[in-house]
Regions:
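Transmembrane helical cores of multi-pass secondary ion antiporters/exchangers
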Residues: 1-398
Length: 399
């Protein structure tokens, strides 16, 4: 929609101001999403269940980054090794929101939906420090003295980000526990606390010189651990606001960022975008699932549904703001084109392919269904799908 209305919507608008609005909106949205996603995942269960999510994160994600960097180095010969690595990292995180029908289709095996959902919830947070490290490496490559400053900045970004996240996560968990035990907060105000906590983590880390994104992600993890349960009801406001901001971000992305990108296309950019959404994702997924006896339809399903979205857009903004890369414009063009193609391709195929995959799975008799896909697992709630609107404290239950 943003792409269609872009030329008319931008008529007479200061693009410099618009770019600033896009950056602010996208960064705020990602901070909320990082907090919400991190707080939804039970890390203890993830450690115990050495299954699809752990394989996709521990094996698939690093291989996706490396293969994406290799493809960038081959197609864009002007990029340095560090710049190619940056492009690989920026396009590694997946965005399950772009294929919502996949993780919410009840006929798709729960273990497969869980794998894609958890992968999407954690890989953007994992990639944030990797991106800062790659940017520091690029600066070190081009200027030794400046690179040393970049390394110091990297340590500060991660260190202060973690510190801000830990403090904010513990603080909001303590507030909810204390207030819940004494009935100090009306039930309708509970969802405000995590939203404020995400903002507190981001603001505290940024003020100290750290990464607000790392802080938001860490705050979500710590909040979940300190609270001792899935804060699904408490995150209702974050989920709803995040969904709205996410939609607005993509509309503006199409109007402001994607449109100009389409005017400077090259065959290398198009080929890289196609490879990024196919082989660069599918080969690592197939390797990660080696030995699980997953069926070919399952490997294809997991490999295809790795949409690129919000995190990649914000990471591209970080590259522009935090680095002095000689070819940052090329990196940004590749990212924007890949995300735009992903929005179109995954949006159109999510429903039909989820139904087709479910039909394949259900075509097997109950006693002969594929073992890997049929294994029972605890399902993590997809973003924005709370099951209970009232916090336990408001019902008189312990928090």
């Amino acid at each position: 929609f943003g792409l269609l209305v872009g030329p008319k919507a931008l008529d007479g608008i200061d693009l410099a101001t618009t770019d600033s609005v896009v950056r602010t909106l996208a960064e705020a949205t990602l901070a909320l999403v990082l907090f919400s996603d991190a707080s939804r995942v039970d890390l203890g269960h993830l450690r115990r269940a050495v299954g699809v999510p752990l394989r996709l994160l521990a094996v698939g994600l690093p291989l996706t980054i490396l293969l994406g960097a290799a493809a960038a180095a081959v197609l864009f010969g002007q990029l340095t090794a560090a710049e190619a690595l940056i492009l690989g990292i920026v396009l590694a995180p997946t965005d399950a929101a772009l294929g919502q029908a996949v993780v919410t289709e009840p006929r798709v095996p729960q273990r497969i939906r869980q794998g894609l959902n958890v992968e999407s919830g954690l890989n953007d947070g994992i990639c944030v420090p990797l991106l800062f490290a790659a940017v520091a490496l690029a600066d070190l490559e081009s200027d030794i003295s400046g690179g040393r400053g970049a390394v110091r900045l990297l340590v500060e970004e991660i260190g202060y980000g973690v510190a801000g996240g830990v403090i904010a996560g513990i603080a909001i968990a303590v507030i909810i526990r204390a207030a819940g035990g004494r009935g100090l907060i009306a039930s309708r105000w509970y969802p405000v606390i995590p939203a404020a906590g995400a903002g507190l983590a981001y603001g505290m880390a940024s003020a100290l010189g750290g990464s607000g994104f790392i802080a938001a992600f860490v705050a979500g993890v710590v909040f979940r651990l300190a609270l001792g349960r899935d804060p699904e009801q408490l995150n209702r406001l974050i989920d709803e606001v995040g969904d709205v901001l996410n939609g607005v971000t993509f509309i503006i992305f199409g109007a402001v960022l994607l449109g100009p990108t389409l005017t400077v296309l090259s065959w290398q950019l198009i080929l890289y975008a196609v490879l990024s959404l196919t082989l660069v994702r599918m080969i690592p997924v197939a390797i990660a699932m080696w030995g699980t006896h997953a069926g070919r339809p399952t490997l294809g399903f997991l490999g295809w549904f790795g949409p690129r979205g919000l995190a990649s857009i914000v990471f591209a903004v970080i590259v522009v703001e935090e680095s002095r890369l000689p070819h940052e414009h090329l990196i940004v063009l590749a990212v924007y084109l890949t995300v735009g193609l992903s929005v179109l391709a995954h949006g159109l195929t999510a429903g039909p392919l989820a139904a087709r995959y479910a039909t394949w799975y259900e075509s097997h008799p109950h006693d002969r269904r594929p073992a890997m896909e049929s294994a029972a697992t605890e399902m993590t709630r997809p973003r924005g799908h709370a099951t209970d609107a009232v916090p336990p404290a408001a019902r008189g239950e312990p928090v």
